[in-house]
């Protein structure tokens, strides 16, 4: 959530920065905020007058005044009027605060100063590439063709069980998925992340804190009777483990990695990636989440990208890093890098990880704070997250980049101890 105080004090600068992301109505928030502050001032003045009336009556009575004295009667009548007015103001002020809060939830994070300005993904900036020497020269088949030929991927039966955009992994396919998950977790634990296995059903407050609600409600699967949602990413449950908490500053940074199945309706992707593992309603992912001191978040963001990239390098999968422009930036992110892996069948790089720095945006929505030892007050932590990695897309990249002329697939060296085999 954006900082209302910052918006109030610097509306022009705030609006200019936010305009790099699109057109947002900040004036409506400012107008409501002005009304709410006027009501707050009026309430404070009335409360002070009510207190003064009570004090004056008490002093008069203590001094022996007659309760029927006209002055006492007038003060009591005024006191009753003031209390009635206060009673009327309270719901108005409460409703205004709620309306302001709802509007604030619709405003995205401010982009960082070094985020490229652009309307869409065509303005993203390539930062680096790795592994050009590993790009295969004669890869011909798409991963779904390889998987179906080997009998390790079954999409047709998945449609029978559920609908389109689901996959069933069979035999070595299921083993490869499991090996990738275990390898990714092992690597990140070694890098200093603490593994957690969180719930995959999350409540509305959790999705609101991380920024999926209210904007992306149509993208998620909901269990309406229970006010629970199927989590679209482990970012949601892991970050919300600390919602409404005050963390000791000495306990920062907090690093977590988590494997979960993820669920997305993909409502806006009709006709895109209709085959294969790239865009499914249910998929597995290993997520990296950081809660850090504001002074270290920029450095931790760069380190997060390296943690995600280390998986691709260990698998010897060619990839590139893009910095997203303002028009392609996620709703909650202030700055984001995408890692894209090479897919020979498409002859291009495809996203496999997004590594975002949210600054205090999510922490403000989720009320996640920290306290310095010996100091008064609290501050909001900075949160970061990135995929480490999307497992299905990693499998697709392995199948395509490691396919052999005879139709088999070589198992990457680092996965052989997990799979106990060298070839699929």
Swiss-Prot record:
SUPFAM superfamilies: Class II aaRS and biotin synthetases, tRNA-binding arm. One of its GO terms (cellular component) is cytoplasm. One of its GO terms (molecular function) is serine-tRNA ligase activity. It is found in: Cytoplasm. Its EC number is 6.1.1.11. GO terms for biological process: selenocysteine biosynthetic process; seryl-tRNA aminoacylation. It catalyses: tRNA(Ser) + L-serine + ATP = L-seryl-tRNA(Ser) + AMP + diphosphate + H(+); tRNA(Sec) + L-serine + ATP = L-seryl-tRNA(Sec) + AMP + diphosphate + H(+). Keywords: Aminoacyl-tRNA synthetase, ATP-binding, Cytoplasm, Ligase, Nucleotide-binding, Protein biosynthesis. ATP binds at residues 264-266, 351-354. Its main location: cytoplasm. It comes from the Bacteria. L-serine binds at residues 233-235, 287, 387. Pathway: Aminoacyl-tRNA biosynthesis; selenocysteinyl-tRNA(Sec) biosynthesis; L-seryl-tRNA(Sec) from L-serine and tRNA(Sec): step 1/1. Consists of two distinct domains, a catalytic core and a N-terminal extension that is involved in tRNA binding. Homodimer. The tRNA molecule binds across the dimer. NCBIfam families: serS. This is Serine--tRNA ligase. It comes from Acaryochloris marina (strain MBIC 11017).
């Amino acid at each position: 959530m954006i900082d209302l105080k910052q918006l109030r004090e610097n509306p022009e600068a705030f609006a200019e920065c936010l305009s790099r992301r699109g057109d947002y109505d900040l004036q409506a928030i400012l107008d409501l905020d002005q009304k709410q502050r006027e009501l707050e001032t009026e309430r404070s003045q009335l409360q002070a007058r009510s207190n003064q009336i009570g004090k004056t009556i008490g002093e008069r009575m203590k001094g022996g005044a007659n309760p029927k004295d006209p002055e006492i009667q007038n003060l009591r009548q005024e006191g009753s009027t003031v209390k009635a007015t206060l009673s009327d103001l309270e719901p108005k002020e409460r409703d205004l605060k709620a309306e302001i809060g709802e509007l604030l939830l619709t405003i995205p994070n401010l982009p960082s100063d070094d985020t490229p300005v652009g309307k869409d993904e065509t303005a993203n900036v390539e930062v680096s590439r790795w592994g050009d020497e590993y790009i295969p020269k004669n890869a011909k088949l798409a991963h779904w063709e390889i998987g179906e030929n080997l009998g390790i991927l079954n999409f047709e039966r998945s449609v029978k069980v559920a609908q389109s955009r689901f996959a069933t992994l069979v035999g070595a396919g299921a083993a490869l998925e499991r090996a990738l998950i275990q390898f990714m977790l092992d690597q990140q634990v070694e890098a200093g992340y603490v593994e957690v296995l969180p719930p995959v059903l999350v409540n509305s407050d959790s999705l609101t804190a991380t920024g999926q609600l209210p904007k992306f409600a149509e993208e998620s699967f909901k269990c309406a009777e229970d006010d629970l949602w199927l989590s679209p990413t482990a970012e949601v449950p892991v970050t919300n483990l600390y919602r409404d908490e005050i963390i000791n500053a000495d306990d920062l940074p907090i690093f977590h990695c988590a494997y979960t199945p993820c669920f997305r309706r993909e409502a806006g992707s009709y006709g895109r990636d209709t085959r294969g593992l790239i865009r499914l309603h249910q998929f597995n992912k290993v997520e990296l989440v950081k809660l850090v001191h504001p002074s270290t978040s920029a450095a931790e963001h760069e380190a997060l990208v390296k943690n995600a990239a280390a998986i691709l390098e260990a698998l010897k999968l060619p990839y590139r890093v893009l910095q997203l422009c303002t028009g392609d930036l996620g709703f909650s992110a202030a700055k984001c890098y995408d890692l894209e892996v090479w897919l020979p069948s498409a002859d291009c790089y495809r996203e496999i990880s997004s590594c975002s720095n949210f600054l205090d945006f999510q922490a403000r929505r989720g009320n996640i704070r920290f306290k310095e030892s010996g100091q008064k007050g609290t501050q909001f932590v900075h949160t970061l997250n990135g995929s480490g990695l999307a497992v299905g897309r990693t499998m697709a990249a392995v199948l395509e980049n490691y396919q052999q002329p005879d139709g088999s697939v070589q198992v990457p060296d680092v996965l052989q101890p997990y799979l106990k085999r060298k070839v699929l």
